Structure formats: structure tokens, C-alpha cells
């Protein structure tokens, strides 16, 4: 069967996978969206799943400073051995992830960390909007599912499109690094700092400053 560009784009939005991977997944599954999602998940996690159960207690705390010192990121990435922690490929991965966080501002590492009450509130908003369209309940639920996946893709680090290569997600980049290095790797936590965030900026009185400087 013929796979349309719309199908490919919808699958890409739902999974964050590359265009060619999405097209192949749809071709392999006869154009079935849900089966194609499962296909991509199995394919994307294949290399990582064999190592996912191994303890990753070594690693690095990486940092990235941007925009003249006004934005900073710390990220902890774990691996299995100190040897890999010193590996250039691993260190580059940590640096890339820190840079991505600075640019994309995720709120969580993975979807399991999202507060259920936050997710439920989003679903209610999506449901209310979808019902206004007058579509059947089964279609409404599919719309909600797609919007929830987009919501995760916006706020969860692993599901975001990787800033240096938007055709793949951070999860895909992580899986590729695991496959290359041969050890389990896990992004544990991160913090992003914006200079002055949360502080009330004092509005200066320019005329008063000039008068004071002139000794008035």
C-alpha cells in the first residue's frame, strides 16, 4: 500500500523518530499507526533493552554555560564503569545533553516523572476541546492520546527532538550511545538556571541617577 506524507508526519510527531524510520515502520506494518509506534519502540530500544537492567552507578555531572553566563545547566549522567566515564564519546554525550537542556528547557527526564494530577488536568483540557468538534468518543480518545504524546514530547527530556539533530529524539541518541559504548547509560537528573529567574528586577530612575551623579 501507499504511505502518505501525512501518515509519516503524524507518526513522527507521536514518536519523535526520523522520517525514514517512520516511513519504514508504516511500510512494515501496513500503514497501521499504532503498530508502527510499537515497531519503532521495539527498534529504538532494542540495543538499550539488553543493558537496561545493569546497574549504572558511575558517570559524570556535566555542565553547560550559555549566553554570557546568563543560562547554566547541570546534568547527571550515569554509566556502569569509571572507564566509560572517561570515554570521549560518553563525555561528548553528556555535553550534548547539557547543551540540549539549555536550549529546549525540559521539565522532566522521562514521562514517568510527570505528576499524575498535571497530566489529568491536561487531558481534561484536550478532552473538552476535542468534544467541541462533535467527533465520536473513540476518535476523541485518539485525539487526546496524540496530544498527550505531544505534551510529553514538549516537557520530557528523553522524548524531545534532539536540538543538534531534530530527526531523532534524545532517547534515540541515548540508545545509539549505549549501542556504541556497550554499557548501560542513564540520564538521572538535571537542573537549569536562568540568571535573575524569580527575582523582581528593580526599575531604575534614570533621571535620578543622572542627578545624583551630577551632585544635585
From Swiss-Prot:
<dbReference type="GO" id="GO:0003746">
    <property type="term" value="F:translation elongation factor activity"/>
</dbReference>
<dbReference type="InterPro" id="IPR014039">
    <property type="entry name" value="Transl_elong_EFTs/EF1B_dimer"/>
</dbReference>
<keyword id="KW-0648">Protein biosynthesis</keyword>
<keyword id="KW-0251">Elongation factor</keyword>
<comment type="similarity">
    <text>Belongs to the EF-Ts family.</text>
</comment>
<protein>
    <recommendedName>
        <fullName>Elongation factor Ts</fullName>
    </recommendedName>
</protein>
<keyword id="KW-0963">Cytoplasm</keyword>
<feature type="region of interest" description="Involved in Mg(2+) ion dislocation from EF-Tu">
    <location>
        <begin position="81"/>
        <end position="84"/>
    </location>
</feature>
<dbReference type="InterPro" id="IPR036402">
    <property type="entry name" value="EF-Ts_dimer_sf"/>
</dbReference>
<dbReference type="GO" id="GO:0005737">
    <property type="term" value="C:cytoplasm"/>
</dbReference>
<dbReference type="InterPro" id="IPR009060">
    <property type="entry name" value="UBA-like_sf"/>
</dbReference>
<dbReference type="Pfam" id="PF00889">
    <property type="entry name" value="EF_TS"/>
</dbReference>
<dbReference type="InterPro" id="IPR001816">
    <property type="entry name" value="Transl_elong_EFTs/EF1B"/>
</dbReference>
<dbReference type="InterPro" id="IPR018101">
    <property type="entry name" value="Transl_elong_Ts_CS"/>
</dbReference>
<comment type="function">
    <text>Associates with the EF-Tu.GDP complex and induces the exchange of GDP to GTP. It remains bound to the aminoacyl-tRNA.EF-Tu.GTP complex up to the GTP hydrolysis stage on the ribosome.</text>
</comment>
